[in-house]
Amino acid sequence: MTDSQKEAPKIEFPCDYPLKVIGVAGPDFQEVVATIVRAHAPEFDASSIDALDSRNGKYLSLRFSIQAQSEEHIRRLFLDLKAHSAVQMVL
């Protein structure tokens, strides 16, 4: 089997799953993201968010982890985050 044919590593659920959300900096961006995340992970603690402004202050990067239950759980959260107009990228 070549490197290109190797399967991606399997994630064992439930697990702590790190996320990074980048969006347009605004007074409520962090709270909007926390609200979306809480809809999928009610135990999420918004005080665990690590926020970093871009050099020019236009964007805000939020890093945090959730307790992911399945690949579908992560996929639904990604879709809801990406659907918000202020969110530019979800990693």
Curated annotation (Swiss-Prot):
InterPro entries: UPF0250_YbeD-like (IPR007454), YbeD-like_sf (IPR027471). It holds the Pfam family DUF493. Gene3D superfamilies: 3.30.70.260. It comes from the Bacteria. GO terms for cellular component: cytosol. Belongs to the UPF0250 family. This is UPF0250 protein HCH_05838. It comes from Hahella chejuensis (strain KCTC 2396).
